């Protein structure tokens, strides 16, 4: 990832998030965010697939914890408050996927031991597809919404909007494209509400 991006765009975005009254989550609390995602992702198609067809909370939790810890230096990861009812994780332009060695060093081995070696093939397959699509539509010149999760008990209270709007305003200010992919049909209208356009759809 371009060093200039780290030095300019990421700090700018983090500053916007703090000014909006949101909570930049320190690395030592990323495990708690993984639990929020684990709760929110119940029956999420992609995680069901990662888990071999049936959702496994521990696999989902470990996967999210490893992913967040791997990207923490480059990502903008923030929550609605210190209570961590919901969070968002964005990656700046130039992101082309997590690197293998950092992934393994941040808990990947534990994930493999729990879920079995087949999960590595699934992760690589999905990330290859996701990054190919991202390159097609943005040429990797985008802010990439890697994750938006709100715990089930906190859903329907406007937390997703609270998390999304400051970052979308920042991207408008910087004249930057925002990009994401979702694997759940019911999520499409949510993101369209925030101004995203649907560019790709393939039936599983």
Where are the regions that the model predicts?
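Conserved acetyl-CoA-binding loop-helix of GNAT-fold acetyltransferases
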Residues: 147-150, 156-169
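Conserved active-site alpha-helix within GNAT-family acetyltransferase domains
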Residues: 161, 173-175, 184-201
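A short beta-loop-alpha structural element at the N-terminal edge
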Residues: 21-35, 43
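Conserved beta-hairpin
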Residues: 73-90
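Conserved acyl-donor/pantetheine-binding loop and adjacent beta-alpha core of acyl/acetyltransferases
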Residues: 87-149, 155
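Conserved GNAT acetyl-CoA-binding A-motif
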Residues: 141-143, 170-183
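Active-site rim helix/loop that mediates acceptor-substrate recognition in acyltransferases
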Residues: 54-76
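Conserved beta-strand-loop-alpha-helix junction that forms the acyl-donor binding cleft
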Residues: 146-155, 179-188, 204
């Amino acid at each position: 990832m371009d060093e200039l991006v780290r030095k300019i765009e990421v700090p700018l975005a983090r500053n916007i998030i703090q000014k909006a009254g949101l909570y930049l989550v320190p690395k030592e609390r990323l495990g708690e965010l993984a639990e929020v995602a684990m709760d929110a992702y119940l029956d999420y198609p992609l995680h069901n697939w990662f888990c071999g067809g049936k959702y496994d909370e521990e696999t989902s939790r470990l996967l999210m914890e490893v992913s967040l810890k791997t990207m923490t230096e480059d990502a903008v990861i923030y929550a609605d408050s210190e209570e961590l009812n919901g969070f968002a994780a964005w990656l700046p332009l130039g992101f082309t996927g997590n690197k293998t060695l950092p992934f393994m060093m941040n808990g990947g081995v534990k994930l493999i031991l729990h879920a079995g070696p087949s999960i590595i093939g699934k992760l690589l397959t999905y990330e290859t597809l996701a990054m190919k699509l991202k390159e097609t539509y943005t040429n990797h010149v985008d802010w990439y919404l890697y994750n938006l999760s709100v715990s089930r008990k906190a859903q329907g209270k406007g937390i997703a909007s609270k998390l999304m709007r400051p970052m979308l305003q920042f991207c408008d200010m910087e004249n930057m494209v925002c990009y994401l992919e979702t694997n759940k049909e019911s999520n499409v209208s949510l993101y369209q509400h925030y101004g995203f356009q649907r560019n790709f759809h393939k039936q599983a």
